[in-house]
């Protein structure tokens, strides 16, 4: 036996480098093959394959952690109800006369854009909506809290950041009061966004009786492979009838009248009408994914009644975008279509301007066609590295005739 053991040890010492090399080679081939077959962006595929082969073993590990989108396969099982909502919204679709009056004749550029976006998103255009812009937390938070206080059936709230500060606590109190009234309440916070406050407000919500969940908390080991897949959606839907969405997180810094330590300028929207059903459906899918609970029943039915009758309503369509989309390039197609349809002007406002080549080229082509293209960026940014990267890209649009404007402080997250 000692002789056999010694022989096995000697055999292993002799062969382990070859076995390890073969294993790394197989993993490298598998990872690079996956990247080539799955990645739809050619540059992304080339970059991942380069990393995988130039850093054997380590590159494949990094690709497995950050390069594989696991959300799509899980979320695809939760989309059946989205088709049902789209069917229900067909009754709220504008007729031909309404489209002619608002968007133009069938040959008009905006009509072709409407058709394009419908085909890309597979979500119908809804009529008879009311959309009200709300500037910052000073305008938006009181209206949102009033909507929560008036809820009679359900409240769905999703936010990337939900700080444990005076504003956050005010929302907790309003949500807790709704629970005590018998309202169905669900709150979804991103796993990384929740960590902006320490300790997280999650425990305070749960102590107040509010059903809350984190979207892919990175503190849980099994969710580590999802670390780069975040939920930045900001959604509030009350009774399936009144919705809010935009750029506002829930944090005291968005209340500029309070002179916060880290002020943030932002814009939010109050939405009434059939399109609110699309907002609610996105939340229901996100909640089912994160909390493993399917929200159903009368409390979670969308109210498809018109918010505005006649010709004063707004045509609207909710376009979802995120790592759970089966076609991650759909937003690029929508933007490219919009820029191609532009006749007079294009106004772009974003806190983080990092467009890919396709969007840059579409902006440049629009400017060279004589369209006025204005890009508004924050004068100061909360992410220094992103600001540097954004500034380094501006020459690509400036030299083709686009105009770039910088807003004064505070940081503009609009």
Q: Whereabouts are the PLM-identified features?
A:
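N-terminal localization/anchoring segments of enzymes in phospholipid and broader phosphate metabolism
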Residues: 1-333, 337, 341, 365, ...
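A general structural motif
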Residues: 137, 323-333, 354-358, 385-386, ...
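Short, glycine-rich nucleotide/cofactor-binding loops
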Residues: 161-166, 349-356
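Active-site lining segments that contact anionic ligands and/or coordinate catalytic metals
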Residues: 313, 343-345, 372, 399-401, ...
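A general structural signal for well-ordered alpha-helical packing
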Residues: 332, 339, 360, 373, ...
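Helical hairpin unit composed of two closely spaced alpha helices linked by a short loop
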Residues: 342, 352-374, 378, 383
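C-terminal structural cap/anchor segments
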Residues: 383-414
């Amino acid at each position: 036996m000692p002789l056999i053991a010694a022989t096995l040890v000697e055999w292993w010492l002799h062969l382990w480098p070859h076995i390890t090399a073969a294993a790394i080679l197989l993993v490298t081939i598998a990872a690079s093959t996956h990247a080539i077959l799955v990645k739809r962006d050619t540059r992304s595929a080339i970059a991942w394959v380069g990393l995988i082969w130039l850093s054997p073993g380590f590159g494949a590990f990094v690709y497995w952690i950050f390069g594989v989108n696991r959300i799509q396969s899980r979320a695809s099982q939760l989309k059946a109800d989205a088709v049902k909502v789209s069917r229900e919204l067909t009754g709220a679709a504008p007729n031909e006369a309404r489209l002619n009056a608002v968007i133009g004749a069938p040959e008009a550029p905006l009509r072709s854009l409407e058709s394009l976006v419908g085909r890309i998103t597979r979500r119908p255009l809804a009529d008879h909506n009311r959309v009200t812009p709300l500037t910052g937390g000073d305008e938006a938070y009181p209206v949102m809290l009033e909507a929560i206080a008036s809820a009679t059936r359900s409240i769905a709230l999703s936010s990337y950041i939900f700080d444990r500060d005076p504003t956050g606590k005010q929302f907790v109190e309003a949500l807790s009061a709704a629970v005590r009234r018998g309202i169905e309440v669900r709150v979804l916070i991103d796993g990384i966004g929740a960590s902006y406050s320490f300790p997280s407000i999650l425990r305070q919500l749960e102590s107040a009786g509010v059903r809350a969940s984190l979207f892919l908390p990175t503190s849980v080991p099994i969710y580590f492979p999802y670390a780069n897949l975040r939920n930045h959606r900001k959604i509030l839907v009350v009774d399936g009838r009144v919705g809010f969405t935009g750029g506002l997180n829930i944090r005291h810094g968005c209340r500029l009248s309070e002179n916060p330590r880290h002020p943030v300028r932002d814009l939010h929207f109050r939405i009434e009408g059939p399109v609110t059903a699309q907002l609610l459906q996105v939340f229901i899918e996100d909640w089912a994914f994160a909390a493993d609970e399917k929200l159903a029943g009368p409390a979670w039915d969308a109210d498809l009644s018109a918010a505005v009758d006649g010709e004063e309503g707004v045509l609207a369509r909710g376009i979802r975008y995120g790592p759970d989309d089966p076609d991650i390039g759909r937003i690029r197609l929508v933007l490219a279509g919009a820029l191609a349809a532009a006749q007079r002007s294009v106004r772009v406002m974003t806190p983080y301007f990092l467009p890919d080549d396709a969007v840059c080229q579409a902006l440049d082509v629009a400017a060279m066609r004589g369209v006025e293209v204005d890009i508004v960026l924050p004068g100061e940014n909360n992410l220094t590295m992103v600001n540097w990267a954004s500034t380094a890209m501006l020459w690509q649009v400036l030299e083709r005739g686009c105009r770039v404007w910088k807003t004064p402080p505070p940081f503009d997250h609009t």
